[in-house]
Amino acid sequence: MGYSFDRASKDVVKKLQGRDLRPVECLSDATKFRLFHILQETPRSGWETEDIPVGFTLLDLLEPNFPVPEPEVSAPKPFIHVQSTDLEANLNVADIARGGVGYVGYGGYNIEVQSTSIPNPKLEILQNRKLLDKLPTFMKFCRMERKNLYVVTEAYEVSKDTMLTGLSSVNLLVKGFFKQLFKVRGKAGRSEKYSIPIPKGSVLAYKKQQLVIENNTCVILPSATKKKMTFPGTPKYASASEPTEIYRTELQGLWINDIEPIGRIQEPAHLDFKCLQYEVSEQTRLLPELSKDVQEVVLSSFLSMLYEGDRNVLHDLMKMLELSQLGHMDGPGGKILDELRKDSSNPCVDLKDLILYLLQALMVLSDSQLNLLARSVEMRLLPHQVELVTSILQPNFKYPWNIPFTVQPQLLAPLQGEGLAITYELLEECGLKMELNNPRSTWDLEAKMPLSALYGSLSFLQQLQKANSSFKPSLRPGYI
């Protein structure tokens, strides 16, 4: 149970309970969401939209020699969070074997956060200001593609250096069938300890307001509700890599936007799991069209990145592909870029779009889930995990409130020992409360998006592994 930066950010957002407050997901970008920084909204397919810092502030775009509003700074607010998990279970769910598995984990933070903001009355100073005659090149791209731009008007920054710490440990008592399977005796286990420094000034959460640019002047709307486009009146140049606006609206409705009042029994019929299933299958069916060599490079490269559980590398690769910049990267990300430069795959299949789709799903997950996915591939758990996640999503997807459900015992039977602990931890990280000895749980609306992204990631990796059945990832030290 790793306590990552993005998880801490989401937790702080929950505790602040601020309307329209969004968490910063990546520590490497934590200084790029400060006041006046400009963000480009980019769709993550069905999962959600992402705000990408463009590297400029609003002040960089306006004509010089103008007054700048003074930000309001709040007093630091302390946030302390400690979370621990202690799971223990027998391995005889289906009387396959006798033994035991235990998982112990803890993680948390002690952090001080303060808000810097520019309220709407103070923003009046910047309204209808003239832009520079020569604007940065990214503005031309955004105008042509009708990308919406936003400006950060409130940021919650860490007021002093702090540290995220944690430990996770799996202990496995193996007997009978599992003793033969794992070829170990008695107890075995794996333990990981970590610490993540968060420097002063890192932004954990922010609020944004939309920019509207017309007649070489800039207007800041009171909110980010997208009532207008940033570049109104500009014709849209369709991009093959993006879903249509209507389809994207439906997809976004799957998560939050179209939730009906609590008086309804369920959401509209078109907002069900079949829509997500169709989207994922449309992507995974294209993977077998790639050559075996390309598929193996993609699978092995992603496994290397997932083992590290470092979303910064995945995030950097995703941003490069979204901006169509095949620059230099070291490590496994560089191998994927090399394949994209070769452009030797099936001309009917866009390799960049497929890789981008998986990256967008993975970025919804936590750092510890990334590592758990790699171990799931290694233990060949994916088919069972896809079936289990499907059984949870399919009946509950359309319900916009918490309802109890029961995990089917026959779906747990193949997931024994460490495999069961890994799978349950994946589900817990999505926001579901799971107990190894109890198949009952409760559907939580907030788990809908991460659980859907987990379904997409598992399905994608399963298809790659199926096509590379002879591919055997090397076992990492300390891994059973």
Curated annotation (Swiss-Prot):
Disulphide bridges, residue numbers: none
Organism of this sequence: Mus musculus
Annotated spans, Triggers pyroptosis: 1-226
Record remark: domains: Intramolecular interactions between N- and C-terminal domains are important for autoinhibition in the absence of activation signal. The intrinsic pyroptosis-inducing activity is carried by the N-terminal domain.
InterPro entries reported for this sequence: Gasdermin, Gasdermin_pore, Gasdermin_PUB
Gene that encodes it: Gsdmc3
Alphabetic keyword roster: Cell membrane, Cytoplasm, Lipoprotein, Membrane, Necrosis, Palmitate, Transmembrane, Transmembrane beta strand
Protein's recorded name: Gasdermin-C3
Keyword Transmembrane listed: yes
Protein origin, superkingdom: Eukaryota
Bilayer-crossing regions: none
Upper classification of the organism: Eukaryota, Metazoa, Chordata, Craniata, Vertebrata
Pfam families assigned to the protein according to its UniProt record, in alphabetical order: Gasdermin, Gasdermin_C
Homology family: Belongs to the gasdermin family.
Gene Ontology CC terms: cytosol; plasma membrane
Post-translational modification: Cleavage by CASP8 relieves autoinhibition by releasing the N-terminal moiety (Gasdermin-C3, N-terminal) that initiates pyroptosis. Palmitoylated.
Single biological process term from Gene Ontology: programmed cell death
